Amino acid sequence: EDGTTVDSLTVTAKKAPEREAIEAFVSSVSDQTANRRLGRWDRKVCPGVMGLRNDYAQLMIDRIATTATEIGLEVGEPGCKANMIIIATAESDRLVRQMVKDHPDAFAKYDSGIRRSRRDLDAFVASGAPIRWWHVTARVTADGQRYKLGDDVRVREVSRLRGGTRDDFATVIIILDARRVGTLRFSSLADYIAMVGLAQVDPDADTAGVNSVLNLFGDRAAGVEPVEAMTAWDKAYLKGLYEARRDVRRGAAQEGDIARTMGEELAGEGEKKKGE
């Protein structure tokens, strides 16, 4: 015997690194609305593409539609009024400045509870990113009734955790700068646009080290071969967002829902690979 005696031992289990990585990804990617919640499309989305050849535009719409359908959304028929507007241009800086000047209501409707900060709008205008995006969200009741500030509305089931209202996307504007985008796989470009069009992604999200289509431009700049399409992480995030509670008071509750769903989905992916 070495004379060493252990009277008691307390073991505190740490979260698996995977769980911590998932929570960090969700926290970084999620960009909350002015109401401090996570917005999403309600039931239907209609992507429209301008500035690309018709065949490429249709391919992009089809790819977005496939992802939208997978997360339970309906996609508008051909000719529907676009609410996810994708514009490709060689002069994105000039175009964005002109759009904000000529159509201010397309970016912030001050009487509808969908206003984001002027700082956010200034950052959108000043962005030199290959792709930039702007989400306009509408505050609605839990059963989908839109209202303006000051309106009388019937709100059900308000509690400490549930707010009785939610944030739905009204319009998403995505600007693609053809010169800055350069040469990329079309599948990865279309999936990047689908990701930022279906979720309110933080333009400053730090997703380095995660296998995600959101690293498309960062990987290229670092000399790393970008992914070819949405990854399991991206798809799990979207699934989590569209299954998360919507009428919560704070986005943190939604982020928790997303992280749980991602954990389940990614664990399933791991088991699937083991069995292959």
Segments (PLM) and residue ranges:
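Short, flexible turn/loop "capping" segments at secondary-structure junctions
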Residues: 4, 37-42, 166
